[in-house]
From Swiss-Prot:
Family annotation (SUPFAM superfamilies): Complement control module/SCR domain, LDL receptor-like module, TSP-1 type 1 repeat
Name of this protein: Complement component C6
Subunit structure, as described in the record: Component of the membrane attack complex (MAC), composed of complement C5b, C6, C7, C8A, C8B, C8G and multiple copies of the pore-forming subunit C9.
Gene Ontology CC annotations of this record: extracellular region; membrane attack complex; plasma membrane
The gene coding this protein: C6
Compartment(s) where it occurs, according to its Swiss-Prot or TrEMBL record: Secreted; Target cell membrane
Biological processes annotated in GO: complement activation, classical pathway; in utero embryonic development; innate immune response; killing of cells of another organism; positive regulation of immune response
Major location category of this protein: secreted
Coiled-coil blocks: none
Residue ranges of every copy of the MACPF domain listed in the record: 176-522
Length: 934
């Protein structure tokens, strides 16, 4: 066989040698065909316009010429539009702000250039409070009660200082006892040390500590530059103005991509102890108050700049410190505004209300740090130009540092670096290595914003002037920032207020839910192994080295990897609390899963934590104060000389007055948790041999507790406990459906079918293609054709109540089957209402409406429905909305003689008025078509 192939090849070469070589361009190409996809990498092709003649055969053009070519097109990823859920209920009225709030959640952030969400996530309205705006504190017996409600030590009364904040401690004072011999100025910018810090956004928020409070102590600190000492706040453990700034501590780092930059920046943001104490979430995230989110918005600029070109980055930074400070570990004085916000938190958990604490005051507070500034620039370079320069990564860093010093930003002595002026990149830009960068972006902290922004520059400009750095340095003294800090959770400050333990636990729960809103697990995977980052309601892609583009969809010539690293999906909801008072949640490495040799996700796929379970039906949150919180582990273990230890209990059981040790002969009663009842003999007795008498008792289920589901799902009916045989329905916002069964029944063992912790909403099959084809249709090639109710409607879509005109029966159908049937000209099926068919006023009016619609002169399609004479179609909800009777026209088409209301007097109305009156649930009796007799 091989011999024959060799002979054929030799003959072909001989023939080509004897003939003229085919000039393939003699046959022109057609235009490229249209792309097979509008996004997500389609293909297009073209063909040669071949003319088969003697030249074609003589010169073997059929063998030598490529007749068809294909290429990729529309590489950009399909846009994903932002989707918001509905607003929740209004919160209770805040007595201090006289406002109430409601919020909506982001069901899906925008990505890949999709439409952003423009509606506000939070809305307020004025209200009339039922409480006074006062501070209530516990244990105020031996203290002075301020008019505001705050308690202060009695020794602070009449000392000439406003310790209450409202000066009520200085009224009606015959004599004052000054604390200090004269008035001293507080430490400059001391209030900055008391601000909260939003860890997720990387920025300061509202004041949580009252650092103007001195606590009746005249503690002073002096700086070497000032002749007069400063008064120290009672919240401060230590203040030190003797800060040495090392002139030559300018640092640089090289980053091949922003993924490694972000990871390094996050690890630098917290101390080691704090990182293990708090959740590991990046600080570069969107803040709702984005007008103050300088650091977050600046990093987003860096990300978007990296999309323009395959880039590498060099960061240069330096700390400037004015003073160091350390807060006291306990007995911190809270600011009035923060204390009032804590006091007026509701006892019952409300995610929206508790989350406002983090929006207004941040998630952490400063335990130590420095006042000053941070010179911090990141330079973007073309990766290709940097490689062609001939410099190593270390040499490139040295050149950035050398030229920064040379330009007299920092007025340091420098050593001449020939490699920085005589490399290919610098020579291309007149001997300047920095001029060869694409741009620099300011991540500067402290100082006036105008001077901080002037430190950065764009390619093609002359760059910052020599005096810019010195001007910024001077402005740092007037406008310092907290730098080089350590943090503690803001929940640690919730002390010495009514129900402190309850509110502290609620805040910790809210913080977990709040942090989940910043988790990029909600984003779709980015092309070419990019890492998604959630910025408000938009997902951005951070590109790997060698890739770029708006969504990292473009590759540099040297990028050959097809590996896809795994990324975590979102955490499931927490499981119910088990008998060991533990609950758990899981996540999967599927966003995306590792492919083609990619790395798996780092970290654990399961979490566990302590939890509490109510042994009785929950009738409200208990108020637990700090001094009431005592755990069994704090109690001394008794000496077990005689008697019985705790008895073994059946599942879902407990005992009243539980003890560590029971006397011989003592009995205990077995009780069951809410939703269970005891079957058998419920009493156990401690025997002389220190064992328990065997009792045949078990806890059998009599009801089911409300299941724990994700926030996006709505449970109907909403109850705390459901009896065996009762059912619930799970629903989603409009345009979304439950990604699984929507109806569940309480059975003897549990909910049937089992309710998954990861159950959520997904886009309805009808909504997915609505931009391409009308509802009930699907795309086939370039055309839209009707869906098949049997073949195309297997995926879940919302339930509708439908009336079949042929059989005069109503039934529940999926929206997909209903719309597919309408497309196939099934005129017998009519929409009654959304949701399953259930007896009641909604079903009665829906059926009566269809009877009345037979004579309607108006038929306007509106979502699933058709609007008639007495209705208008709402463009916002795609529902038919009834007119008010006065809004109906006075035409005399389709008249009816009716009796309306309790008076039941006869009246002639048209079909619009009749429908509007019935829609308003007003009693109407139709006497006959046409006018009433005179």
């Amino acid at each position: 066989m091989t011999r024959h192939l060799t002979l054929c090849f030799i003959l072909l070469v001989m023939l080509i040698d004897k003939s003229e070589a085919c000039f393939c361009d003699h046959y022109p190409w057609t235009h490229w065909s249209s792309c097979s996809k509008s996004c997500n990498s389609g293909t297009q092709s073209r063909q040669r316009q071949v003319v088969v003649n003697d030249y074609y055969w003589k010169n073997l053009c059929d063998k030598l010429c490529i007749k068809q070519e294909t290429r990729e097109c529309n590489l950009q990823t399909c846009p994903i539009n932002c989707v918001l859920g509905d607003y929740g209920t209004w919160s209770d009225c805040d007595p201090c702000t006289e406002k109430q709030v409601k919020v909506k959640s982001v069901l899906r952030p925008s990505q890949f250039g999709g439409q952003p969400c423009t509606e506000p996530l939070v809305t307020f309205q004025p209200c009339v409070p039922s409480k006074l705006c006062k501070i209530e504190e516990t244990n105020c017996k031996n203290k002075f009660l301020c008019d505001s409600g705050r308690c202060i030590p009695s020794k602070l009364e009449c000392n000439g200082e406003n310790d209450c904040g409202d000066n009520s401690d200085e009224r009606n004072c015959g004599r004052t006892k000054p604390v200090c011999t004269r008035i001293y100025t507080p430490i400059p910018s001391v209030q900055l040390m008391g601000t909260g810090f939003h860890f997720l956004a990387g920025e300061p928020r509202g004041e949580v500590l009252d650092n103007s409070f001195t606590g009746g102590i005249c503690k002073l600190v002096k700086t070497s530059r000032a002749s007069n000492p400063y008064r120290v706040s009672a919240n401060l453990e230590n203040v030190n103005f003797e800060v040495q700034t090392i002139e030559d501590d300018l640092k640089t780092e090289f980053y091949k991509n922003l993924i490694s930059f972000e990871k390094n920046k996050n690890e630098d943001s917290l101390s080691v102890d704090e990182r293990t104490k708090f959740f590991p979430i990046p600080i570069f995230h969107f803040s709702e108050k984005n007008e103050h989110s300088h650091y977050s918005s600046a990093f987003n600029k860096v990300i978007k700049a990296s999309h323009k070109k395959d880039s590498s980055f060099i960061r240069i930074h330096k700390l400037i410190k004015v003073l160091n400070f350390t807060m006291k570990a306990t007995d911190l004085q809270l600011s009035d505004v923060f204390l009032k916000a804590l006091v007026h938190l509701p006892l019952e958990y409300n995610s929206a209300v508790y989350s406002r604490i983090f929006d207004d005051f941040g998630t952490h507070y400063f335990t130590s740090g420095s006042l000053g500034g941070k010179y911090d620039l990141i330079y973007q370079f073309s990766r290709q130009e940097l490689q062609n320069s001939g410099l190593t990564e270390e040499e490139a860093q040295n050149c950035v540092q050398y030229e920064t010093k040379k330009l007299k930003f920092l007025y340091m002595e420098i050593h001449k670096e020939d490699t920085c002026t005589k490399n290919k990149l610098s020579e291309k830009y007149g001997g300047s290595f920095l001029q060869g960068s694409e741009k620099s972006i300011s991540l500067v902290q402290g100082g006036r914003s105008q001077q901080a922004a002037a430190l950065a520059w764009e390619k093609g400009t002359s760059g910052p002037e020599e005096n810019v750095y010195s001007e910024w340095l001077e402005s740092v003294k007037e406008n310092p920032a907290v730098v080089d800090y350590k943090l503690a959770p803001i929940t640690d400050l919730v002390r010495n207020i009514p129900c402190a333990v309850t509110k502290r636990n609620n805040l910790r729960r809210a913080l977990q839910e709040y942090a989940a809103k910043f988790d990029p697990c909600q984003c779709a995977p980015c092309p070419n192994n990019g890492r998604p980052r959630l910025s408000g309601t938009e997902c951005l892609c951070v590109c790997q080295s060698g890739t770029y583009g708006e969504n990292c969809e473009r590759r540099s010539p040297g990028y050959k990897s097809d590996a896809v690293d795994g990324n975590w999906g979102c955490w499931s909801s927490w499981s119910a609390c088990n008998a060991a008072y533990r609950r758990s949640r899981t996540r999967e490495c599927n966003n995306p899963a590792p492919q083609r040799g990619g790395q798996s996700c780092g970290g654990k796929d399961q979490q566990e934590e302590d939890c509490t379970v109510s042994i009785m039906e929950n009738v409200g949150q208990p108020c637990i104060n700090d001094d009431e919180e005592m755990k069994e582990v704090d109690l001394a273990e008794p000496e077990a000389e005689s008697g019985c230890s705790q008895p073994p209990l059946p599942e879902n059981a407990f005992t009243w007055n539980e003890k560590k040790l029971y006397s011989v002969g003592e009995e205990v009663e077995i009780s069951c948790l809410t939703g269970f009842t005891a079957v058998g003999f419920q009493y156990l007795r401690c025997l002389p041999d220190r064992t328990w008498s065997q009792g045949d008792v078990e806890c059998q289920r009599t009801s089911c507790l409300k299941p724990v589901v994700q926030d996006v799902l709505t449970i109907s009916p909403f109850q705390r406990v459901y009896q065996i045989g009762e059912s619930i329905e799970l629903t989603c916002p409009r345009g979304f459906v439950v990604a699984g069964p929507s109806r569940y029944t309480c059975k003897e063992d549990s909910w049937t079918p089992p309710i998954s912790n990861s159950l959520t909403c997904e886009q309805a099959i009808l909504t997915k293609s609505k931009d391409l084809c009308p509802p009930g249709q699907k795309q086939s090639g370039s055309k839209c054709i009707c869906m098949s109710p049997e073949e195309d409607c297997s995926a879940y879509s919302e339930d509708l109540c439908i009336f079949d005109g042929g059989s005069s029966q109503y039934f529940t159908s999926s929206a997909c089957k209903f719309l597919a049937g309408k497309c196939l000209n099934n005129t017998q099926s009519h929409f009654v209402h959304s949701g399953s068919c259930q007896e009641g006023l909604q079903l009665e009016w829906g059926l009566e409406r269809l009877k009345l619609a037979v004579n309607s002169t108006k038929r306007v399609s509106c979502g699933y429905n058709t609007c008639y004479d007495w209705e208008n179609c709402s463009a916002h909800t795609s529902n038919c909305v009834c007119l008010l009777p006065p809004q109906c026209s006075k035409d005399e088409n389709q008249l009816y003689c009716v009796k309306i209301g309790s008076s039941m007097r006869e009246k002639t109305v048209n079909i619009c008025t009749l429908g509007a009156v019935r829609c308003a649930n007003i009693k109407v009796e139709i006497l006959n078509p046409g006018r009433c007799p005179d």
